[in-house]
């Protein structure tokens, strides 16, 4: 099986990182817009968002119209669609590719140390728990 098929078969095993669900619900409740920009396919992404009750302002997955990360296309499209200024935006990611996308889009990057990426670079904003997001965005 290819990766995409295998990952769809195992999607029910995926669990969110600690505090992510509560914090996303907190953002939504406080009218803070957030989007999902991922390298994962739309079908799997939508399934997981529905499963965990996450309702982002928009969802951006690989497609034929926009270049994927590290290109900034999806981030810039999300900002435009949601009427968010670059100066007000943050992109949370866990890989160097995520950082490069944010840098190319000229938006602030928050490195999630608990994720996949094991990058030794020291980023201006880093979190080891998603709950720390409030401190960075000054909520």
Predicted regions and their residues:
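Short, basic/glycine-rich phosphate-binding loops at helix/coil junctions
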Residues: 1-7, 54-59
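Short, acidic loop-to-helix structural element flanking the phosphoryl-transfer center
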Residues: 5-36, 42-50, 72
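Asp-based, Mg2+/Mn2+-dependent phosphohydrolase catalytic module
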Residues: 41-139
């Amino acid at each position: 099986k290819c990766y995409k098929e295998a990952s769809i078969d195992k999607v029910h095993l995926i669990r969110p990182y600690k505090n992510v669900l509560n914090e996303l619900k907190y953002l939504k409740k406080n009218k803070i817009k957030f989007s999902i920009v991922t390298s994962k396919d739309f079908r799997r992404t939508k399934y997981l968002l529905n499963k965990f009750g996450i309702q982002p302002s928009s969802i951006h997955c690989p497609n034929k119209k926009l270049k994927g990360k590290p290109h900034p296309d999806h981030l810039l499209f999300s900002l435009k669609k949601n009427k968010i200024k670059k100066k007000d935006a943050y992109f949370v990611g866990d890989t160097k590719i995520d950082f490069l996308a944010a840098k190319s889009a000229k938006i602030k990057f928050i490195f999630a140390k608990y994720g996949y990426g094991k990058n030794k670079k020291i980023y201006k904003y880093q979190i080891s728990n998603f709950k720390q997001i409030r401190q960075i965005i000054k909520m």
